[in-house]
C-alpha cells in the first residue's frame, strides 16, 4: 500500500504557538506510520518556515518538533508570488496533503489556507472564508445574527477609536451590556486575553490587556449557564458528535485552565435533555453551514437553567491536546482519536477532488 505523504504544519507566529506544538505532538503519536509518511513543517515564532526530515518512530516531546538553522529553512513562495515547485531531485518528498495544526492569527485565520489554495494542495480543515470568519469573533457573530442563531448581546471596538475617547467606549459598554461582561480580543482563541469585568476598574484593565493581542476587541454580556460543546465533522453533509459539558473550578474557562492546569471537569455526554441536545446539534450545524465550513468545527454554547441555548462561538481548528474536548467528544461518539485524524484527512482529499470539478474558463 502506498503511503500518504502527510505534511504536518505547526507552530506559527501567534500567541498560541505552544498550543500548536502540543497539538502536533498528540497528532504524531496517533498517526499510523504504516499508512502515513509524516513530514514536519514548523513555523517559528518569528514566522520562518522550517521543513524537517520525515518522522520515523516515536516523538516524545514538543522540543523535538522545534527546528532551527538554515539547513531546515524553506520559503513557501518566492518574492514574485510564484509558487516554488519541488526540485526534480526531491519529487519523492512532495506532499500529498497538508494538516495545518495552527491556532490563532497567521494560521487559523485563513492566511495559510489561502496559501495552500494557491499551491493547489489538499489540506485538512476549513477554507479561507470559514477560517477568517471563524477567527474574527465580531465577523462570526455578525454572521450568526444573520443566520438567526440565538446569542449573547455584544459590541465591539477598534484600538484607534478607543484611544481617542476611552470614556465613551466604557460608557457604551455600561449602557448596552452592563456588568458583569466579558472583554475578548476579536482574533484570538484558547481564551487568551479574556477577562470578566464586574466594574469600571476591571473593564479598563481588560481593555488594556485585550488590545495588547489585537487591534479589535469584542465585549459580550454575561450569560449565566452551563458551558457545553459539540463537534461537527464533514463537508457538505456534516454530522455532530455527542454534546459535552465543561465544568470549570474557576469562574470561567481561561487559557491556564485549558492548557496548563487541566483544572476542569469534562462531562461527556453532557447530562442534558434530548430536546436540549437536539437544539445544540441543530444550531452547531447551522453555524457550520453559515460559515461555509469544511472538515471540522467545535461549537461552544451556553445552556441556561430554563433550557435556553445561546451559541458562543465556533472554533475552526480545535486543539488535539490531552485536555482537548473535540477528540474526546468523537471518542464518545464512536470514533477513536486515530480514526478521527484519518477521517479528517479523507475529508480534505474529498473536498479537494470536488473543487477540481470547478470550471475556471468560459
From Swiss-Prot:
Keywords linked to the UniProt accession: ATP-binding, Cell shape, Cell wall biogenesis/degradation, Cytoplasm, Ligase, Magnesium, Manganese, Metal-binding, Nucleotide-binding, Peptidoglycan synthesis
UniProt pathway annotation: Cell wall biogenesis; peptidoglycan biosynthesis
Binding-site residues for Mg(2+) 2, renumbered to this chain: 313, 315
Span of domain ATP-grasp: 141-346
Pfam families registered for this protein in UniProt: Dala_Dala_lig_C (PF07478), Dala_Dala_lig_N (PF01820)
PANTHER family (alphabetical): D-ALANINE--D-ALANINE LIGASE, D-ALANINE--D-ALANINE LIGASE A
HAMAP family per record: Dala_Dala_lig (MF_00047)
Name of the protein: D-alanine--D-alanine ligase
Gene from which this protein is expressed: ddl
Amino acid at each position: 500500500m502506498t503511503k500518504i505523504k502527510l505534511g504536518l504544519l505547526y507552530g506559527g507566529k501567534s500567541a498560541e504557538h505552544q498550543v500548536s506544538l502540543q497539538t502536533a505532538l498528540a497528532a504524531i503519536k496517533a498517526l499510523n506510520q504504516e499508512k502515513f509518511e509524516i513530514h514536519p513543517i514548523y513555523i517559528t515564532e518569528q514566522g520562518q518556515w522550517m521543513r524537517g526530515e520525515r518522522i520515523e518512530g516515536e516523538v516524545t516531546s514538543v522540543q523535538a518538533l522545534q527546528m532551527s538553522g538554515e539547513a531546515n529553512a524553506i520559503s513557501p513562495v518566492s518574492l514574485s508570488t510564484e509558487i516554488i515547485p519541488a526540485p526534480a531531485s526531491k519529487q519523492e518528498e512532495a506532499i500529498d496533503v497538508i494538516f495545518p495544526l495552527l491556532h490563532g492569527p497567521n494560521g487559523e485565520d485563513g492566511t495559510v489556507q489561502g496559501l495552500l489554495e494557491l499551491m493547489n494542495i489538499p489540506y485538512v480543515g476549513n477554507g479561507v472564508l470559514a477560517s477568517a470568519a471563524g477567527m474574527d469573533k465580531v465577523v462570526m457573530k455578525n454572521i450568526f445574527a444573520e443566520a438567526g442563531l440565538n446569542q449573547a448581546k455584544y459590541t465591539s471596538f477598534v484600538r484607534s477609536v478607543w484611544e481617542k475617547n476611552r470614556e465613551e467606549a466604557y460608557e457604551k459598554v455600561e449602557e448596552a451590556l452592563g456588568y458583569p461582561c466579558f472583554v475578548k480580543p476579536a482574533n484570538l482563541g484558547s481564551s487568551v486575553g479574556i477577562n470578566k469585568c464586574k466594574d469600571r476598574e476591571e473593564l479598563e484593565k481588560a481593555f488594556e490587556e485585550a488590545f495588547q493581542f489585537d487591534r479589535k476587541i469584542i465585549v459580550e454580556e454575561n450569560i449565566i449557564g452551563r458551558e457545553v460543546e459539540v463537534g461537527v465533522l464533514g463537508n457538505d453533509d456534516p454530522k455532530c458528535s455527542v454534546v459535552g459539558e465543561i465544568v470549570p473550578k474557576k469562574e470561567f474557562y481561561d487559557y491556564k485552565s485549558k492548557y496548563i492546569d487541566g483544572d476542569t471537569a469534562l462531562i461527556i455526554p453532557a447530562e442534558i435533555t434530548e430536546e436540549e441536545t437536539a437544539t445544540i446539534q441543530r444550531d452547531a450545524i447551522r453555524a457550520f453551514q453559515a460559515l461555509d465550513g469544511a472538515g471540522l468545527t467545535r461549537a461552544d454554547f451556553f445552556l441556561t437553567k430554563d433550557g435556553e441555548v445561546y451559541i458562543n462561538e465556533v472554533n475552526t481548528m480545535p486543539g488535539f491536546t490531552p485536555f482537548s474536548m473535540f477528540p474526546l467528544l468523537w471518542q464518545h461518539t464512536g470514533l477513536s482519536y486515530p480514526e478521527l485524524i484519518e477521517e479528517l484527512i479523507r475529508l480534505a482529499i474529498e473536498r479537494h477532488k470536488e473543487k477540481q470539478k470547478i470550471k475556471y474558463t468560459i
